[in-house]
Amino acid sequence: MVLDLDLFRVDKGGDPALIRETQEKRFKDPGLVDQLVKADSEWRRCRFRADNLNKLKNLCSKTIGEKMKKKEPVGDDESVPENVLSFDDLTADALANLKVSQIKKVRLLIDEAILKCDAERIKLEAERFENLREIGNLLHPSVPISNDEDVDNKVERIWGDCTVRKKYSHVDLVVMVDGFEGEKGAVVAGSRGYFLKGVLVFLEQALIQYALRTLGSRGYIPIYTPFFMRKEVMQEVAQLSQFDEELYKVIGKGSEKSDDNSYDEKYLIATSEQPIAALHRDEWLRPEDLPIKYAGLSTCFRQEVGSHGRDTRGIFRVHQFEKIEQFVYSSPHDNKSWEMFEEMITTAEEFYQSLGIPYHIVNIVSGSLNHAASKKLDLEAWFPGSGAFRELVSCSNCTDYQARRLRIRYGQTKKMMDKVEFVHMLNATMCATTRTICAILENYQTEKGITVPEKLKEFMPPGLQELIPFVKPAPIEQEPSKKQKKQHEGSKKKAAARDATLENRLQNMEVTDA
């Protein structure tokens, strides 16, 4: 995931100042741009020198061949004139005045210089890439410039009644319909582990079927992705911070052979976007085949580092969940990817409108965008039981930022003298099932249970097509008694502590009096 290096090269029509401005608008270090430009300039000089040295080496070989053909004496003198050692002034005429033995010595010295130059070039290339991969994509002009998404995310539009309030939050409702085992899930799987069961399993499957059917009717190809990816491929689709904060690493045998003791490092996917992005890695995509639209279905795995204390109960923010994703490869020409961007967010909106979930669309501030996104719109649903908007959908246009690292090119082959173009890649959530379930539970709650949304009824089993009944009391209504019990126990402990302190004081007084 990187920008085009030519954007940093003034002589290639690039504008480093524009990229510095983008970094500043993203509230990231603009100094990375200067470091990259410096490393790239040195790299280009080094490559130019290496090219010249290789030409000189070839010239040496050619001159030796000509002298041998003329049967000139080889000679045994390996001393080389000072003016030849600089290589910069080395010409065919200068070589012609040397013996074969001297030219061989020059060629050997050139080989050493090439090795030294190559080592320096590799070092500079690594330095350049380290900076390049931490510089974000160019921003779309409509992105709000701010580093505070809580205040400055721009609301683009609202659908439905986002003021209504209801009694219970999803944390209580998943228990009331007996569709969730949280404590046992945590014992088995650790923090945020859970079992989804009973009616909520059917509701999740209904959402998956409805989402896939909706996308299928719009020309999307359903695709069920691998759950893990090789490290070298994941490095091409994920930014560096994700390896520390989001991705789970899996270590396994390198092959199925029993005598193979090698180990392979892989990463569990955080979204089907990652494997689908790599699906056409190293390919040329024909213009007439675009756009290619995929409806990705996968289980997703996320560490959620940095979210400690947030949404610790229920199923809204968990380490493992199912998700249907929109992913599109688009033409880089004629604003096609931005037209597709609007189409994808519209598809998501119409899906949630059909489910009767109120929401607003927010334009995410520059400081909260990941490196790849040129622009991101979120669909945040209204949760009437929680009294808050919660994110259900993220829609991003990454332009050619991802495709460049994955080498997914636009066109059939590289034409002579033409610059290679890369496809644009876009992604948008269609349905993260656990979050959508939470939104449905809060919006469709009644006194007796959860009314099943009209569009999901045909996918639910008999007896659950109209109403999902409450079968357990709300945990929040049991909590006061628990709190009172804890308060009572706390009062007893405090009283015991006071008594112990008083007794100690009395004993001290007795000792003093004595």
UniProtKB/Swiss-Prot annotation:
Quaternary structure and partners: Homodimer. The tRNA molecule may bind across the dimer. Interacts with SIRT2. Interacts with METTL6; interaction is required for the tRNA N(3)-methylcytidine methyltransferase activity of METTL6.
Modified residues (N-acetylmethionine): M1
Family: Belongs to the class-II aminoacyl-tRNA synthetase family. Type-1 seryl-tRNA synthetase subfamily.
Site residues by UniProt (Important for serine binding): T429
Domains: entry comment: Consists of two distinct domains, a catalytic core and a N-terminal extension that is involved in tRNA binding.
A Gene Ontology cellular-component term: nucleus
Protein name: Serine--tRNA ligase, cytoplasmic
Gene (name only): SARS1
Gene Ontology biological process terms in this record: cytoplasmic translation; negative regulation of angiogenesis; negative regulation of transcription by RNA polymerase II; negative regulation of vascular endothelial growth factor production; selenocysteine incorporation; seryl-tRNA aminoacylation
Phosphoserine found at: S241
Organism in which the protein naturally occurs: Pongo abelii
Name of the top EC class for this enzyme: ligase
EC number(s) on file: 6.1.1.11
Example of a GO MF term: selenocysteine-tRNA ligase activity
Alphabetized SUPFAM superfamilies for the sequence: Class II aaRS and biotin synthetases, tRNA-binding arm
Record's subcellular location: Cytoplasm; Nucleus
Spans traversing the lipid bilayer: none
Region annotated Disordered, chain positions: 472-514
Modified positions (N6-acetyllysine) in chain numbering: K323
Motif (Nuclear localization signal): 482-494
Superkingdom of the organism of origin: Eukaryota
InterPro entries: aa-tRNA-synt_IIb, aa-tRNA-synth_II, aa-tRNA-synth_II/BPL/LPL, Ser-tRNA-ligase_type_1, Ser-tRNA-synth_1_N, SerRS_1_N_sf, SerRS_core, tRNA-bd_arm
CDD domains in UniProt: SerRS_core
Pathway, per record: Aminoacyl-tRNA biosynthesis; selenocysteinyl-tRNA(Sec) biosynthesis; L-seryl-tRNA(Sec) from L-serine and tRNA(Sec): step 1/1
